[in-house]
Amino acid sequence: CLMYHNVFPEKTEGIISEKEFEKHMEYIKDMKTYKMEELEKMNYILDEKSILVTFDDGYKNNYTKAFSILKKYNIKATIFLNTVYIENDKDYLNWNEIREMYESGLVDFQLHTHSHYPTIRKAEIKGFFEKMEGDFVKREYFSIFREGLSKKEKDEIKDFRDLDFTGLPVFKIRSQISIKGMNLKEGFMDKYREFVNSGEFISKSSKEKKIFLNKLFKMQKKEFFEEISEEEFEKKVEFEVTENKRLIEEKLNKKAEFLSYPWGHTYKGNVERIKKLGIKSFVMTSGKANNVKINPEKIYRINGDKIKDYNLFEKKMKYVYNKE
């Protein structure tokens, strides 16, 4: 099972290009491909020379770039959607594009939680945002920093593009449906700006700044962070899954029962709770290959984004299929 995210027109670090993606699809064009929604009726048993193609998040270029290539080679695929961004962010798909892809018979749409937001795992930073940080990281972190804005700023700053990220702390994070985690307390951003803009702090090296802040956050954790309760966590998990599921099922008149964990961060509670929300299968990002008899509890994926070199991709595919 292959995993992709974006497909860019040109070569970009960390993101597969249109030409690179087409080479991947050309290589697998003679294999049997399936959509996730087809697996249950097959009892999760696939042909020996078969492959699953997946995309996470639901970016616009899945339609503008990848879809035409899938059609060219008649390859089936599944896109795991973050529905909060659909119709609300220019970098993501809209429902008309999603319907067109689904009605083509080639593309299925499944669950990736409603928002894909992270939570702070530990009151410790690992670095700072640079001026040229990409939109993907900023978009993910915006939900964290927005919690720390003042009431006035929350009314004014509604989008990650409105926030200056330069110099903000990069925390250790996890998916908000994986662990309880922590939120920033309201007003954190004002306090943070106050001491990082002081002459004493500015004169420190990046390493010294990190050490200073980690000591400060450890000593005054309750002043800056708020632990998420078990009740809040479970409510969040339920909302993220059920709202994601509701929107896809209502808009496409289909069942959505496969959950791709954001970042591959698995739920640390009793997974039966998530199953009761209508989830039958869980999709990972482990880098492993699946057996012909797929385990619906753990559908593994190989990260196609990271195999940009065609010779390496070919070698990987030969290893996987010769091994089986």
Positions of predicted regions on the chain:
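Histidine-centered catalytic micro-motifs
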Residues: 2-6, 109-116
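Acidic (Asp/Glu)-rich catalytic clusters
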Residues: 29-30, 67-74, 94-111, 275-276, ...
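Short active-site segment of divalent metal-dependent hydrolases/proteases
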Residues: 59-60, 115
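A short alpha/beta connector and helix-capping loop motif
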Residues: 63-83
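Generic enzyme active-site microenvironment
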Residues: 54-55, 110
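C-terminal active-site subregion of NodB/CE4 polysaccharide deacetylases
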Residues: 1-54, 60-62, 121-123, 135-324
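Charged helix-capping and loop-helix junction motifs
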Residues: 17-20, 91-96
